[in-house]
């Protein structure tokens, strides 16, 4: 995939469920539609929670790296 232009980076390293998703929700609401939030996490629950959050809240998970921590997720606000 080509380089993704990130609007904001959210570091949730060391935080455990439900904190990472709560911070994603808080931060993404301050972005405009189409802007990109890069989430960096080490909680294994995020591999399930971030994709579910995107689907439920109608955001787009553009890319993820979940082979080993730290996990990275590129989320576009909106569809």
Swiss-Prot record:
Pfam families: TusA. Disulfide bonds: none annotated. One of its GO terms (biological process) is tRNA wobble position uridine thiolation. Its main location: cytoplasm. Keywords: Cytoplasm. It is found in: Cytoplasm. One of its GO terms (molecular function) is sulfur carrier activity. GO terms for cellular component: cytoplasm. The active site is at residue 17. Sulfur carrier protein which probably makes part of a sulfur-relay system. Belongs to the sulfur carrier protein TusA family. This is Sulfur carrier protein TusA. It comes from Haemophilus influenzae (strain PittGG). The gene is tusA.
